Amino acid sequence: MMNVKEAIRNNLMVELDKCLSSLIRYDVDSLMPLFYVLCAHHEGHLVSIVGEGKSLFHGKMHIQPIEIVDGYESPLLKEIRNSVNPSFFEGQSAEAVFQFYSMCNEYINEFYQDIIEHIISVYTSNAGKYSGVSVTTQEIAQLMGYFISDCAPRRVYDPCAGLCSFAILPELSKIEFVCSELSNRTKVIADIRLNAAGKQLEINQEDCTFNWRGNSNCDCLASELPFGLRLNDRSLDERRPLLLEDFVIGKFIESESLSSAVLLVSASTCIRGNNKHIRKTLCEKNYVDAVIKLPRGV
């Protein structure tokens, strides 16, 4: 029999899905007003969604900046608000958020992390790899988390952090992470996710190929690397572009501080002709403990 808490949570998710169906269009920008209101409420602010007409239900609705309402806005709220055009915080987006918030604000804090994870899950599953948001599936994150934990690292470097799926794993809560992420929109959502999980972590928005942090007192390299992403490396023949996967593995080989690595790479990394020297070096130095081939579609 379903208990009261479970029933409340289920009803909350139903209302959240209604809101998401109104917000989700073609990119993640449409979700930012919802993230903003949720984070503001979680921080204890009085969220103000007002109508610009004579009454609340006539005229265009508008989500007021917390800075105007309370005189202070946290760095996270400011980051969310400044990540998109102000027009996303008014009109239909504001109305959809208002409908959800007015019905469910009483339970937001109780299920806050579940709400954030659900929004990310729904959006990435709908938009797929074209969403522009990189998220490691829970099953893969837990599998890789097991191996990361087994390495007993002090500090982990993730050069392609995405939504920081490893950093929020409970079993890795005591391990320090150094994260780099190229996409600003992904970084913003990762910051929201980390905040919901209670994880204090600064993500560096940068290109890891230009600013490699693997030597920042890190002893473990862990990442889900973008498959087949080509780099323009002037030191190579332009007809044979270097892939990011090969670049990261090469940096691991060169590193004096990184003693272990847990990487998710494309299957072609094990057979490509133009990275044969990398695979040969890994074998000669006895750096490979295991290669696990995942089922198709995982």
What do the PLM-derived regions correspond to, one by one?
Residues 34-127:
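Long recognition/docking surfaces used for binding and targeting
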Residues 229-232, 272-273:
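Switch/connector loops and helix/strand junctions flanking conserved nucleotide-binding motifs
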Residues 232-238:
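Glycine/threonine-rich flexible loop motifs
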Residues 20, 145-149, 253:
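Generic structural signal for well-ordered alpha-helical scaffold segments
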Residues 1-52, 266:
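Non-catalytic accessory regions of SAM-dependent methyltransferases
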Residues 241-297:
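Conserved Class I SAM-dependent methyltransferase catalytic core
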Residues 134-139, 239-246:
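Conserved phosphate-coordination/catalytic loops
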Residues 128-223, 228-230:
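Conserved S-adenosyl-L-methionine
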